[in-house]
């Protein structure tokens, strides 16, 4: 019997380095450093993808889009998110909501959250109100506090399609 609700959790982290663009939630942000990664290294979208895949018991982003596969080199993470939603929907589920937190010292992300919500909602094909995003710092502690990287955490609720 198909469960009416499923919950998934996702996490991602990438190193901040000069010479890379900074993508967050599908929005390019102006900053002196960007995130290193095989794709565009959008930690927020990657955490959301893992939460969605986890909720549907479909493993993780690295399984579906392995960094060893050259077709994903530099890929726009919005494309990966759209493909993940196709997989989720193929299992008979729709998104209930997403709640995500980004941990970064710089840049300040709160001014960009409405744009990120809009982009994510458009890619996932849901209402903006279904996407909750928050930004925090680590009070200068750890790799995030030293501005060596940015991490993101996400929870997704899936609802069985009627």
From Swiss-Prot:
Question: Which GO BP terms, alphabetically?
Answer: isopentenyl diphosphate biosynthetic process, methylerythritol 4-phosphate pathway; terpenoid biosynthetic process
Q: Which reaction does this chain catalyze? A: 4-CDP-2-C-methyl-D-erythritol 2-phosphate = 2-C-methyl-D-erythritol 2,4-cyclic diphosphate + CMP
Cited Pfam families: YgbB (PF02542)
Q: What class of enzyme is it?
A: lyase
Q: What organism is the protein native to?
A: Porphyromonas gingivalis (strain ATCC BAA-308 / W83)
As given in the record, the signal peptide range reads none
Molecular-function annotations in GO: 2-C-methyl-D-erythritol 2,4-cyclodiphosphate synthase activity; metal ion binding
The yes or no answer to whether the keyword Metal-binding is present is yes
**Which of this chain's residues are annotated to bind 4-CDP-2-C-methyl-D-erythritol 2-phosphate?**
12-14, 38-39, 60-62, 136-139, 143, 146
* UniProt function note: Involved in the biosynthesis of isopentenyl diphosphate (IPP) and dimethylallyl diphosphate (DMAPP), two major building blocks of isoprenoid compounds. Catalyzes the conversion of 4-diphosphocytidyl-2-C-methyl-D-erythritol 2-phosphate (CDP-ME2P) to 2-C-methyl-D-erythritol 2,4-cyclodiphosphate (ME-CPP) with a corresponding release of cytidine 5-monophosphate (CMP).
Q: What is its EC number?
A: 4.6.1.12
Supply the name of the protein: 2-C-methyl-D-erythritol 2,4-cyclodiphosphate synthase
Protein keywords: Isoprene biosynthesis, Lyase, Metal-binding
Say which family it is in.
Belongs to the IspF family.
Q: Fill in the subunit field for this protein.
A: Homotrimer.
């Amino acid at each position: 019997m198909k469960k009416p609700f499923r919950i998934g959790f996702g996490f991602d982290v990438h190193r901040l380095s000069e010479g890379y663009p900074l993508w967050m939630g599908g929005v390019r942000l102006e900053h002196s450093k960007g995130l290193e990664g095989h794709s565009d290294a959008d930690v927020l979208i990657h955490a959301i993808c893992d939460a969605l895949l986890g909720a549907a018991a479909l493993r993780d982003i690295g399984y579906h889009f392995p960094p060893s596969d050259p077709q994903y080199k530099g890929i726009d993470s919005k494309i990966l998110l759209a493909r993940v939603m196709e997989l989720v929907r193929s299992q008979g589920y729709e998104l209930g909501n997403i709640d995500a937190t980004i941990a970064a010292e710089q840049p300040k992300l709160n001014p960009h959250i409405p744009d990120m919500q809009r982009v994510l909602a458009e890619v996932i094909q849901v209402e903006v109100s279904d996407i909750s995003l928050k930004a925090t710092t680590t009070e200068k502690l750890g790799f995030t506090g030293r501005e060596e990287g940015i991490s993101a955490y996400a929870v997704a609720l899936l609802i069985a399609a009627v």
